[in-house]
Regions:
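Helicase motor core with emphasis on the C-terminal RecA-like subdomain
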Residues: 1-136, 140-143, 167-171
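Cys/His-rich short segments
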Residues: 144, 149, 153-171
């Protein structure tokens, strides 16, 4: 996955991108790997002090950074119109979340590319996160994950599938 991400970013040199990861640990690891490969990237998550987060966001907005590697909660706070791509390192928790997160790309009306990496291990990890929660919450969480998995596995036009999911018509 790391090699594919590095290759993708290098094919889009100088373009702004956001990479979402499920854990702070993965955010830190991936940002370090990208930096080691001469990619202007930085981590962005709740475990960083507010000064570091603020500097990272400013650097991204001022194009001193090309890539922000973020946890979902913090990546959603980034409002940069010319983000060209969004990459999910891990499968999103729901289609609603995926739709919002990918909405960071192409806000200026130009092309935005969205890439999702996932494996069955991701699904198992997310299911483990649900253990200990009320049964009803677990059931809803599993349903959302199944929908996301079906989306990722589908060979149908994904835009069409997303619009259908939200009750909209494909133009």
């Amino acid at each position: 996955t790391n090699k594919q991400i590095i290759k993708f970013i290098k094919q889009h040199t100088g373009k702004s991108g956001i990479i979402y990861c499920l854990s702070r640990k993965k955010v830190e690891e991936l940002a370090a790997i990208l930096q080691a490969n001469d990619i202007k990237a930085a981590p962005y998550h709740a475990g960083l002090d507010s000064e570091t987060r603020s500097k990272t966001q400013d650097d991204f907005l001022m194009e001193e950074l090309d890539i922000i590697v973020a946890t979902i909660a913090f990546g959603m706070g980034i409002d940069k119109p010319d983000v060209r791509f969004v990459i999910h390192y891990d499968i999103p928790k729901s289609l609603e979340g995926y739709y919002q997160e990918t909405g960071r790309a192409g806000r200026d009306g130009e092309e935005g590319i969205c890439v999702v990496f996932y494996s069955k291990k991701d699904l198992n990890k997310l299911e483990k996160f649900m253990e200990g929660k009320p049964v009803a919450e677990q059931d809803i969480g599993r349903q959302l994950l199944q929908e996301t998995e079906a989306y990722a596995e589908s060979s149908v036009c994904r835009r069409k599938m997303l619009l259908h999911y939200f009750g909209e018509d494909y133009p």
